[in-house]
């Protein structure tokens, strides 16, 4: 070999160099190849405002593992990257930056604002892309896309116009979710609900005829200003005679009717509900049924409108306090009751959402939802784990029309134009329009589309649609979507119906759902808790491979996982073990070593390691097929650390020391298995495996494009199981010596009672090397009553005690140890029988004490056994 592996594992020394080598070689860029099967993943496009966080790191690691595995398995693999324009988040960042300059966006106008936005995107938008590269993401960067690039914009207009012409998109005045901070409408999926402590204000609304009043309760007394009716259930005998009568609205003194509607629950509260069509979605529907007036009482930033001078300009919560005081003064307030209820908040800023009636653009969802439901029911797309089917179905079966217009400037401007002269409206792909009726210039709708409208088209718009490109025909439908369970509603559902509607096929075969990365205590990472972990800092300290391997081994589809530095350190230690083992092997190869594959006439221990590798290759392939990435990585870890490093390398040392043909055969097998396990590990830890591969092979190829190991029946050696018996026997001797606290340096005879004497005579050298045996005797029967014994499924082993320990001294030591353990047992038993301790101590402390007791009991049993032996 021309090169030598560095003395210590220092990932900073080679990770950037390796990544550049891959990228420059074109390894990430697939081609349309009819001889190869395509495998496609589209990246969930991170926001241009974003910085890499642990959720991204998990998401990208899982995708990269699948892509690298499929690439090595002979597929034409496309991992298509890109970023999302993120309307609300990006606009908020730019508005905040302008605020610091003392400028409002309205001061400079739309065009100047958009110039700033594009400049901001150019400056910061690529930041997260560079961070993804640090992780080792093998995306095809030549195909990188942006949700507002020319191609995506073309697709957005095409879909909008198609839906509009088919009656699937309409403009109407409906109740929507309004964020008073972001100053835009948001969709139902963008509203997050949280339980908040609030109140029920019990109020009296007097009848106009003076015959009495109706009592009702509300959690939002400030909306009373917009009440246009009070409703009761038509079957409620208490109020049947009052339906149709008129009430006087407190404070406002407006006349409002009593209406009968099935929406009202008779057994909830008094069975009377105030109806505010402009500020409650259910009230809006009641208002439509009864032709009620819709009165908006709030401005865009949730302040009371000028129509109510006493409260005009007050924030909604400030107005609430004033209105409650005035209701009290008027005698309309009966009581205030504590009440906790679900409150909708904006998923972007956390502000309480204000339901309000507004003229917006909507997508009719029912016709689009059913095909998306059928596709999963028919197995065209499957969720992993399957339990997420239920969430997907529930959302689609209860879906409402999707509000797609946003009162923002950054985003895809709605391609609708209005004529202010004659009132005509047209929807067109053109950037400017002339009125077809009167010939006057038309004004484009100022609103932009919901960010998720363009993201919904991502699997096909990025491949050239609406043009029928070769890439689209070859790489669509995509194969696997990897995403968190938190965006099933936002993104997965919308891609499903968009793909089916516009392409006639599902956008992906499988949706692999992962959970959140939580902190060590199981808490969600957040700015407010200050418990977020920066993946780039982890990479800087431990290397990208350590972070990737920790995320892979901790992953089970659909489940949350916990991050800890200790887990990353363990992964780093594993990388270090691999590095040192590889260095040892290469240092023991001659300079002119030539690799010629696996030699013939293998020794038993060689056939054992080859069979073990063949078995693990088969299992890992099966695990990856089932998306059991965590299980697969654990099996590779066990093979490399326990089987190859701790056993096989040690088994070959006598042959390497002996030299000659025996040494050459051992070297050849060591390298054959090493090459295979580097390939097996590569998708999980790409950098270290490539660096070792480059040194091992003198750069003859790159491991990234090598073939992934698969099961081969010719490497299933029937007698490999025989050597497993030898391993079990050595392990049993080691365990027995450890129990007796005998150091490895102290050697003793080993007598093996077996019906297979030749197996153990031929492997005696391994007992001497690995079990501290001074000599190995093999026979069918031994009579050694004073010897220590160890038993496996195949043999009984005797170790003469007099060669290991002074029996009297050892008994005295064990007795002293037993007395100490008995004291611990007495103390812990007394503590855990104390009812006061059990009642007052934290649950974690009680559990910890119980664990100590169990450990002490186990130790006592072990000591008794040793003394009896």
What are these regions (language model features)?
Residues 33-94, 147, 156, 216-219, ...:
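N-terminal catalytic cores of NTP/NDP-binding nucleotidyl/phosphoryl-transfer enzymes
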